[in-house]
Amino acid sequence: MKTGKFIVIEGLEGAGKSSTHQVVVNTLTEFGIHEVVFTREPGGTPLAEKLRYLIKHEAEELVTAKAELLMLYAARVQLVENVIKPALARGKWVVGDRHDLSSQAYQGGGRGLDRHLMTTLKNAVLGDFKPDFTLYLDIEPEIGLARAKGRGELDRIEQQNLDFFHRTRERYLQLVQQDPNAVLINAGQPIELVQQDIRKAVQKFIEENV
């Protein structure tokens, strides 16, 4: 049996990950790929969902940047080992809403955590496991946050100041440029053009890998 592929959707708040998810699924379906597993990070297993709540909601004490990072990696390893890897081994494709790039950008860039710590933790938890393909939806933080606010109440991370999101975006851009398996999508375009670019990128990946 062929192993499946792991596609990840990344981006700041309000970049359009939810609508991108549907475009990816529709494109996979057009190519006859129906066995798809959907994941989100943090979350995706009973323990990971509990950690998601702790990460995203205000706590009775200060949540330090390192504690936040460690909770994210605890949730991630549960998801990877218990859901993603088994699904890929069964030949299913996995479409993920965020993965390790989010931690590298948000905690490494936004929080300013030490790059050596970030790399060491990533290698210890994930080893050589990584997505086969990443779609990064790039958007100006001001626009993305305005969209996020329009959806309702912001969570603990979404409430960070604008400088935090500019640092996060800057790190995202650096990492995407270094990753040959990542594609940058201009999410500031009209939605029709964004979806068109996503479909083309996914189609190209499928044609080259199936």
Swiss-Prot record:
Keyword Nucleotide-binding annotated: yes
Gene3D superfamilies: P-loop containing nucleotide triphosphate hydrolases
Catalytic activities: dTMP + ATP = dTDP + ADP
Entry keyword set: ATP-binding, Kinase, Nucleotide biosynthesis, Nucleotide-binding, Transferase
Residues where ATP binds: 11-18
One Gene Ontology term, aspect cellular component: cytosol
Gene Ontology molecular function terms on file: ATP binding; dTMP kinase activity
Membrane-spanning segments: none
Listed CDD domains: TMPK
Domain of life according to the entry: Bacteria
Record-linked InterPro entries: P-loop_NTPase, Thymidylate_kin-like_dom, Thymidylate_kin_CS, Thymidylate_kinase
PROSITE patterns associated with the record: THYMIDYLATE_KINASE
EC category name: transferase
EC number: 2.7.4.9
A Pfam family this chain is assigned to: Thymidylate_kin
Biological-process GO terms, alphabetical: dTDP biosynthetic process; dTTP biosynthetic process; dUDP biosynthetic process
Entry function: Phosphorylation of dTMP to form dTDP in both de novo and salvage pathways of dTTP synthesis.
Family indicated by similarity: Belongs to the thymidylate kinase family.
Name of the protein this chain belongs to: Thymidylate kinase
Record organism: Histophilus somni (strain 2336)
Protein encoded by which gene: tmk
